[in-house]
Every structure is written in structure tokens, then in C-alpha cells.
């Protein structure tokens, strides 16, 4: 019952935000919950482990143009399924909008599928809080972060 209520709350809160992104030439990345383990101030680094690579571009939903120097905060469960400072990072997209991050495959956390949390920020755009869900058996993925311009 509690899981159902949580899902309903997510749909109500984030569904409205997702609908606000409709009509853009570049579909915005869907928002997702930040969860209870976010902590600001993660060290600037692009690697917290090896075995899984996440790459992509930060883009504008308005015209699909790339956004350089966007701040991306990342956190994930460690191999043992526990969150900790060793599994947190802050990185920035390159001038061409691209980013790359290396980690281990996140360990199991409760009944949740393996996932990586991300927050993307850039001047002139709404903050994006989302999650990347790993496909089983993969060693990497491309995950673009498409941001909605400020009103």
C-alpha cells in the first residue's frame, strides 16, 4: 500500500513537471525522485569505480543545442548496496556538452533496480533531478540530460 501511495505521489508531482516539457523540439529528460541519500558538496571527479560507463550530452529542450559547463551531481549505491561518500561525484559537461562518468554497477538497494541518481544544473535552465536505470548485463549506456529553459 505504501509503495502504491509513493508511486502516486511521484506521478502527481513529477507528472506535472513532465507535462510542462511537452512541445519542445528536444524531448526533456523525465524527472525522477532524488531519494533520501542526496548530499551536496560531492568532490569533483569523473570516476568512483570501474565496470560501468555513463556518457551523454547536456542539451537544451528548446532547440537541442548543447549546454557546456553544466554541473552534474551523481550518487549511487556502492557494490554492497549502501550509499556513501565514496560513491558521489560532481562533474561538468565539456564545452561541447558531453560528459563521461565511470563507476561500478550499483549494488542492490532494497527492491529497487540498479540505478544512478543525477542532478543537472545550468544557468538559464530548470534544475533536472533524474535517475538512470541500468539495463541488466550492460557495461555502459548513453544518457542525455535534456534541460527545460527557465520561464
Regions found by a protein language model. Give the residues of each.
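Bacterial N-terminal signal peptides that target proteins for export
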Residues: 1-5
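Bacterial N-terminal signal peptides
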Residues: 6-15
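Sec/Tat signal peptide C-region and signal peptidase I cleavage site
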Residues: 16-20
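Beta-strand-dominated extracellular/periplasmic modules and repeats
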Residues: 21-151
Amino acid at each position: 500500500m505504501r509503495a502504491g501511495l509513493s508511486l502516486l505521489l511521484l506521478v502527481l508531482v513529477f507528472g506535472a513537471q513532465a507535462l510542462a516539457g511537452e512541445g519542445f523540439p528536444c524531448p526533456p529528460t523525465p524527472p525522477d525522485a532524488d531519494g533520501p541519500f542526496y548530499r551536496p558538496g560531492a568532490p569533483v571527479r569523473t570516476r568512483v569505480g570501474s565496470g560501468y560507463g555513463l556518457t551523454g550530452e547536456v542539451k537544451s529542450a528548446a532547440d537541442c543545442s548543447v549546454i557546456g559547463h553544466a554541473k552534474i551531481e551523481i550518487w549511487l549505491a556502492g557494490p554492497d548496496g549502501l550509499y556513501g561518500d565514496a560513491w558521489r561525484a560532481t562533474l561538468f559537461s565539456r564545452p561541447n556538452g558531453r560528459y563521461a562518468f565511470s563507476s561500478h554497477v550499483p549494488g542492490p538497494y532494497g527492491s529497487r533496480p540498479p540505478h544512478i541518481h543525477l542532478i543537472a544544473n545550468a544557468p538559464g535552465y530548470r534544475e533536472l533531478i533524474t535517475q538512470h536505470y541500468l539495463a541488466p548485463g550492460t557495461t555502459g549506456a548513453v544518457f542525455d540530460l535534456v534541460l527545460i529553459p527557465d520561464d
